[in-house]
Regions:
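Short glycine/proline- and aromatic-enriched beta-strand/turn motifs that initiate or cap beta-hairpins
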Residues: 20-62
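Predominantly the C-terminal beta-signal and adjacent terminal strand-loop region
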Residues: 84-86, 160-241
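Transmembrane beta-strands of outer-membrane beta-barrel pores
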Residues: 37-43, 75-81, 104-106, 126-132, ...
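Short loop/turn motifs that connect adjacent beta-strands in outer-membrane beta-barrel proteins
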Residues: 20-30, 68, 106-120, 159-165, ...
Length: 241
């Protein structure tokens, strides 16, 4: 009877041990760096959106704290400022944002031990925008900075050994929350905070990300099966008696 009880206990322990958990991450695990580029255009006030495209290029550095939630810092430089008159500089505008990232595929589908070939990631956050210029019109205005808000979806494709690389396509909308650029083309921060389509632009970028190797030997989160070896050894000893 005692052995039967011990056998049941061993079976229960086996089932418990089969439960999977994420291996604990260290401080510098799950960090990535990426480059991106594409085009943007003002959402309203265009005489044909194709003629108002503004090229941009950017850098993103981020960290995933779990397979679902992470943060990133991103900076993009814009090389045109259509539909307005050129500001006279190579880089016309920069936007630097602190972003929250949510892996919707892992949230709703669970994490399976490695990234899926295709994932959808929500991206949102606040940023600082700065307008550059060297002409008289620019110098005559007071405000060249504004508060921005980026809302985006990344359609990401993971590839390479250990899924260390990721390519993504990102449609986004970026609001100038406190500017009146539809009224004064070079005067940004002179209005209250608001979500206004006239103070926004849409953007389509593509990006390439590299995920650094982690302490678990892979480039992503790792699932492990927790075991208490001391308890297992004790039960084996009792079964043998």
């Amino acid at each position: 009877m005692k052995k039967l009880f011990v056998l049941f206990a061993a079976a229960a322990m086996t089932l418990t041990a089969s439960a999977q958990a994420l291996e604990e991450s260290k401080t510098f695990d799950n960090i990535y760096i990426g480059i991106n580029g594409g085009v943007s255009t003002k959402m309203t006030g265009q005489n044909g959106w194709l003629g108002g495209l503004n090229p941009n290029a950017g850098l993103r550095i981020g960290r995933w704290f779990t397979p679902v939630f992470g943060i990133a810092v991103e900076g993009n430089a814009y090389f045109s400022n259509k539909p307005w008159v050129s500001t006279g500089t190579i880089v016309r505008f920069v936007n630097t944002s602190l972003l929250g990232t949510v892996n919707l595929s892992n949230w709703f589908g669970g994490y399976k031990g490695q990234p899926r070939p295709f994932e959808v990631i929500a991206v949102a956050g606040l940023g600082w925008g700065h307008l550059f210029g060297n002409d008289a019109n620019y110098k005559a205005t007071t405000y060249h900075n504004n508060l921005t808000n980026k809302l985006a979806l990344d359609f990401a494709f993971n590839f390479g050994a250990d899924k260390a690389w990721q390519f993504y396509v990102e449609p986004a909308i970026i609001y100038g929350l406190n500017d009146r650029t539809d009224v004064v083309s070079r005067n940004l921060a002179n209005d209250g905070l608001q979500y206004n389509a006239n103070h926004s632009f849409v953007q389509l970028n593509a990006g390439l990300v590299y995920k650094f190797k982690t302490s678990n030997g892979t480039h992503n989160f790792k699932i492990v099966t927790p075991r208490d070896q001391n308890e297992i050894d004790a039960l084996n000893s009792q079964i043998s008696d």
